[in-house]
């Protein structure tokens, strides 16, 4: 699978910004939404890109303006998480999930 195929762009989803996330399950659950205008008040924040069904396609942890880590997600047609492509500390991991009916 070509990793470039996973990367959503602004045209494939809407971006929103958050202070943190909760839980340990994937996809991450971003919490405490903030406005784009307030980003300069935060050293660290999470940028999430969401599709029309509000599924997160991409989650980036931004620290001092630089992307420190990111999660790229793909879903089965029924909305269940299919793949998590995680890039952190220059290490890439893929986690495949079974489709649950």
Question: Model-derived features: where do they sit?
Answer:
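Buried hydrophobic residues that stabilize the cores of well-folded domains
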Residues: 1-101
